[in-house]
Amino acid sequence: SSDLEGDRWVWQEPDRMYGDAVETVKAAVEKARIAPQQVASICMDAQMAGTMGIGKKGEAVTPYDSWLDKRCEDSWEELRAFGEDEIISITGAPVTYAHGPKILWWKKHRPEIYRKIDKFVPPGSYLTMRFCGLTGEQAFIDHTYLHFSGFADTRRKAWSDRLLRALGVEESKMPRIVRPWDLAGGLTKE
């Protein structure tokens, strides 16, 4: 479920997302009629085009800023000033309501919160991190999400120093880039 504020803001509370994911896994285990200890692995699939900020301990610092949220529209001009054709050439995607403008919005409009953010991650990464007890330093993004980031060179599967520098975003706020099949970690007892 989403929370709405006016006609431009659409977000989701991370703790609620996590609780819903835990309940879904519990229901799947019950429906399968297996013991929780028999679960060999879990794969997360979640929304791709929005982002959220996490702290050093992996805790949510911001709500999940949905791709439906339009408050970041004023950041489009910054990106377009860089050159939309150039952004498409580097990232493989046009300027949209995805990660890039949202990150710039947090930096411009909520600098006190932006400073507390260790990494920006999509919700699937956040949920996996919670399930595995990972820290901000261990934060990751699956390379198939990079075209939404607004800051990645999708051909190289790496963060674009050129875009990050031009838009004043620290590379340290970007998570490590992984393959979709990489193992993130083990499940916590929680």
Task: Report residues per predicted region.
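N-terminal glycine/serine-rich phosphate-binding loop of ATP-dependent small-molecule kinases
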Residues: 1-62, 89, 116, 165, ...
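Acidic, glycine-rich active-site loops and adjacent beta-strand->loop/helix elements
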Residues: 3, 48, 70-71, 181-183
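Short, charged, surface-exposed secondary-structure boundary motifs
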Residues: 4-5, 75-78, 151-153, 187
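Short, surface-exposed amphipathic charged segments that create phosphate/polyanion-binding patches used
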Residues: 9, 79-83, 188-190
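Glycine/Thr-rich phosphate-binding loops that ligate phosphate moieties of nucleotide
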Residues: 15-16, 40-82, 111-112, 137, ...
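Conserved FAD-binding subdomain of flavin-dependent enzymes
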Residues: 31, 81-86
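Gly/Ser/Thr-rich active-site cleft segment
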Residues: 86-190
